[in-house]
Amino acid sequence: MGKVIVKIKLTNQGDLVTFNRKLSKTKPRTVEVDAMVAPEATLLYLKPSVIKKLGLERTDTVRSKTTNGDALRFKYASVRLELMGRAEEFSVIEVPEDVPNLLGQVPLEVLDFVVDARGQKLIGNPAHGGEQMTEEY
């Protein structure tokens, strides 16, 4: 399967909450970036340059299994991720600048997208008629 690249919109969730509660008149920091769809990865992984533009606060350190072995990675405060008309809040794991932004399995599951390997694109889950749906069983 070839690489599937998507354009994602990211908004600093803390900024968004503060703005929506009218505690700040400053618009939330937002960026649009390309991300590689990576179902073999777990979470949402962003480059340091993207994290800096969003002004995200470091919250923790996590262990991560990578193609180069185990690594310690920084975890950051949440972003609102928007993709193809769907949106949800996700925490962020930092990857080195030379690694692409990665959209892993958890965001794909929550947003209910799957990779169409034949078409080399991301699509709404056909098991749910292409519409976003949660499963509770």
List PLM regions with ranges:
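Pepsin/retropepsin-fold aspartyl endopeptidases
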Residues: 1-137
